[in-house]
Amino acid sequence: MPVQLKNDTLKGTFLIASLNQESDWIEHTFVRTVVLILEHSSDTGAVGVIINRPLGEKVKLYSSEALRKVTEGIDLTGDTEKVSKIFFRGGPVKQDSLVFLHQLEDIIPDSVPIFHDLYAGGELDALRAHDTVMDSAEPILRFYLGHAGWNEGQLEGEIERGDWILCPGNSNLVFSPTPETVWQQALYTMGDKYRPLSFFPEDPIVN
């Protein structure tokens, strides 16, 4: 399904890494990633977060102090299993910074709408007052350490080169219970010529 640009912006769009990203001559930072674009302008560039790189056990590489720092005092370090499911590596830029996505616009003021049922940022103080959101059975919150960024015209050049496949964003993939398969899920839902790519093995030699 092609993406229709609104006001010449890719905000709210998924960038699905094409197999071009697996070429030897390209840095492999974004191999099999899905990036949600949070900001985009032809004049200033783009900012997004990788939605399918959960920290998992790697969350242990971040000290309790560091986690508290990036969450501005929200103590999420008591339950490592829980934290490992909601913390993601958002990208290679400013990995000591925090971006968070949620569906809590009713309780978090100043949230920025990304699309109809997904919001970014807002006042973390309000989140502290609603600890129950961390215990919700349904995923409604994700934290991303770092982000992906492109200078003016850079992303457009990568798209033209075929490095990215554009897909309309949706919250189901952002909050997928199996983020490790989001790349495959995104391609499969695209259908047509993209669906077969979702079955392409990471190492064709061993297939």
Predicted regions and their residues:
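A short aromatic-anchored loop/beta-hairpin motif
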Residues: 1-144, 148-207
